[in-house]
């Protein structure tokens, strides 16, 4: 039986009803649950297994029975490890029913169906005597996220110790330690604040208003693969320091709120703009089995891992890869200037039950530092990547070059399409006679209105709908400009909504109006990812346990609920190019409604496994042959087959993950079907050996 659900089509901007099976939401949740990524984390799996073997053997030697509780069992992998390690009884709980049902089948397939009691509940709903016969004396769980406590670990451990565990219970992991490193990074700071927009001569065009300068930003973490941040892009001002410990094993409750004030000294002069954050866990009681989420430069096993992997991987990629536990950036509310090496300052570290926040001050604060929130609309409206994109100087210069060469003072009448288009506002500062700004989003509009007021721009008018434009306004237009950027866009080509808006007014536009961008090209590039492909790759077996039933479940769900192309920030996920990029679609915005059906083949020029296809959009600002007239959402440097691709760091690209071929391939075949009036843009890919 089918049902209909409503969704916004980003290309048409229309709400549409889509026919989906009754179990669509179930398939979507299964496909996006992220269990596969964890199961590809070989270090996590090996060390959990080693800790279970060591702990259970130690309990046996002490003459104790071993009764295990596995909270959030997922596939049942940790429960099967506990059985293999010799536990007397194992109880597992899993509240996500599709996963629990799959775990039941996996346990049976691995001969553990009658050895593990599976409870389809949250651990906080379990009652001893009703759901499990006795309290457990060994808890094994994976309740952690990038922030460590963001998935509710504090409350879950507190409840387990109070209700489900014996007084002398052991836990795997036993403890966690959190680390902070204060740094300066002009590049990373672009993800958090708005810079002045200047013309090509460096003269200011738009200044941020005072409310943006005084805003402390959002305290929420910015999770990134920190090892991929170029070493040239930041200055470490301190060594990593331990800020909090979490003892998962102690019977006493873990505090839901704590503060730590550290007096530190700067290693070199700079601005304390941000905090790099990560954690490690001691999986066994003795602290001998350690798993660290540190970036490569702070990883305790860097030398051994570098020697082991040799020249196959760049140094930032020799440490174990995982996408479920990354590192985080926290932005200091007001950057602190440290004018010399050895300068003392105070780092305030805080956590509540689910999150952390930080502050840096020269003097010790006299009272607790409250968690800060956005007061300027910027941080609450736009993603980190969009804020960085607004600040991206090389990109902005290409738009400003077009505007400076195209706008005639007191003569040009400009229509700006898109959300948060400060570059469009810059046309007013460049002398345009009038600027009509299409900005239907309430918070984005409020932010732009504050910028207009602060910069005393007198000739700007805001619009909710392009259809509301009068014929006289349209007839007077000389320019239509966009980046384009729209808040509903996820994939780069979702910003083709620019073309949809143009078609609504096309018949009423003067013939000589200049439209920029005039066209857009989508490129495809076969690549070999070092690691990213694992998020969609089948697991097969893990530590000797057969997980093919899990693979089948995820594959069925992915076929029904996951797009063939998904958005990823590829600068965080290294990949080698296997060929040159190939154009797979060219759209002229003056004729946007034209349908396209294309196909082609890309010859692989470098040996390697094609485990991904990267896609992006190049925006052509004006019809000429200058590379400066192109703004790309893809590689930031020319692509060379066999070499790692350097990607734009302020936008997400599209990625297709092909199935692993049974034999080496020589060509990637592709087809593109674009129906703009329906907002349908579909790609298919096939791998062939010729």
UniProtKB/Swiss-Prot annotation:
One of its GO terms (molecular function) is histone methyltransferase activity. Its EC number is 2.1.1.-. InterPro entries: Arg_MeTrfase, MeTrfase_PRMT7, PRMT_dom, SAM-dependent_MTases_sf. Residues 14-357, 366-690 form the SAM-dependent MTase PRMT-type domain. GO terms for biological process: peptidyl-arginine methylation. Keywords: Methyltransferase, Repeat, S-adenosyl-L-methionine, Transferase. It is an enzyme of class 2 (transferase). The keyword Nucleotidyltransferase does not apply. Belongs to the class I-like SAM-binding methyltransferase superfamily. Protein arginine N-methyltransferase family. PRMT7 subfamily. Essential arginine methyltransferase that can both catalyze the formation of omega-N monomethylarginine (MMA) and symmetrical dimethylarginine (sDMA). Specifically mediates the symmetrical dimethylation of arginine residues in the small nuclear ribonucleoproteins SmD1 and SmD3. This is Protein arginine N-methyltransferase 7. It comes from Drosophila erecta (Fruit fly).
């Amino acid at each position: 039986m089918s049902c209909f659900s409503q969704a916004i089509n980003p290309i048409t901007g229309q709400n549409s009803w889509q026919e989906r099976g009754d179990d669509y939401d179930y398939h979507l949740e299964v496909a996006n649950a992220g269990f596969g990524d964890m199961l590809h984390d070989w270090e996590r799996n090996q060390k959990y297994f080693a800790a279970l073997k060591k702990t259970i053997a130690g309990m046996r030697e002490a003459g104790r029975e071993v009764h295990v509780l596995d909270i959030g069992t997922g596939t049942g992998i940790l429960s099967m490890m506990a059985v293999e390690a010799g536990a007397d009884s194992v109880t597992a709980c899993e509240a996500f029913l599709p996963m629990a049902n799959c775990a039941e089948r996996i346990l049976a397939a691995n001969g553990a169906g009658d050895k593990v009691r599976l409870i389809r509940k949250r651990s906080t709903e379990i009652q001893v005597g009703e759901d499990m016969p006795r309290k457990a004396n060994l808890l094994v769980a994976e309740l952690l996220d990038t922030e460590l406590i963001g998935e509710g670990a504090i409350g879950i451990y507190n409840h387990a110790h109070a209700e489900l565990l014996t007084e002398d219970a052991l836990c795997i992991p036993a403890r966690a330690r959190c680390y902070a490193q204060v740094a300066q990074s002009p590049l990373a700071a672009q993800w958090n604040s708005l810079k002045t927009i200047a013309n090509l001569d460096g003269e200011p065009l738009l200044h941020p208003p005072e409310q943006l300068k005084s805003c402390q930003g959002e305290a929420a973490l910015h999770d990134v693969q920190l090892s991929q941040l170029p070493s040239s892009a930041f200055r470490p001002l301190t060594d990593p320091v331990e800020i909090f410990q979490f003892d998962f094993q102690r019977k006493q409750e873990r505090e839901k709120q704590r503060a730590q004030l550290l007096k530190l000294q700067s290693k070199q002069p700079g601005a304390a703009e941000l905090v790099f954050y990560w954690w490690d866990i001691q999986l066994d009681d003795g602290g001998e089995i350690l798993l660290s989420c540190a970036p490569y430069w702070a990883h305790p096993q860097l030398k051994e891992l570098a020697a082991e992997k040799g020249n196959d991987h760049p140094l930032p990629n020799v440490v174990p890869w995982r996408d479920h536990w990354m590192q985080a950036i926290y932005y200091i509310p007001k950057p602190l200037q440290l004018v010399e090496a050895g300068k003392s300052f105070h780092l305030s570290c805080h956590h509540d039950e689910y999150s952390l926040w930080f502050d840096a001050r020269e003097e010790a604060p006299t009272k607790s530092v409250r968690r800060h929130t956005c007061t300027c609309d910027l941080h609450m409206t736009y993603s980190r990547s969009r804020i960085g994109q607004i600040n991206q100087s090389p990109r902005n210069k290409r738009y400003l070059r077009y505007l400076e060469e195209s706008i005639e003072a007191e003569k040009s009448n400009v229509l700006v399409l898109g959300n948060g288009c400060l570059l469009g506002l810059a046309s007013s500062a460049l002398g345009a006679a009038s600027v009509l700004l299409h900005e239907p989003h309430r918070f984005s509009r409020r932010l732009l209105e504050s910028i207009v007021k602060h910069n005393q721009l007198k000739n700007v008018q805001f619009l909710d709908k392009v259809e509301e434009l009068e014929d006289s306004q349209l007839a007077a237009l000389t320019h239509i400009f966009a980046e384009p950027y729209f808040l509903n866009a996820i994939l780069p080509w979702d910003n083709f909504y620019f073309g949809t808006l143009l078609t609504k007014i096309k018949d009423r536009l003067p013939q000589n109006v200049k439209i920029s961008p005039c066209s857009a090209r989508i490129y495809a590039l076969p690549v070999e990812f070092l690691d990213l492909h694992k998020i969609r790759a089948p697991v097969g077996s893990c530590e000797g346990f057969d997980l093919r039933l899990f693979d089948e479940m995820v594959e069925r769900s992915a076929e029904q609920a996951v797009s063939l192309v998904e958005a990823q920030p590829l600068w965080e996920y290294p990949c080698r190019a296997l060929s040159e990029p190939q154009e797979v679609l060219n759209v002229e915005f003056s004729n946007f409604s034209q349908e396209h059906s294309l196909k082609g083949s890309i010859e692989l020029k470098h040996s390697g496994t094609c485990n991904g296809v990267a896609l992006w959009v190049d925006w052509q600002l004006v019809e000429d042959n200058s590379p400066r007239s192109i703004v790309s959402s893809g590689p930031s440097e020319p692509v060379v087959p066999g070499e790692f691709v350097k990607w734009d760091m302020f936008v997400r690209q599209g990625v297709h993950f092909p199935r692993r071929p049974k034999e080496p391939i020589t060509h990637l075949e592709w087809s593109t079907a674009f129906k703009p009036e329906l907002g349908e843009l579909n790609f298919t890919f096939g791998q062939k050996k010729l």
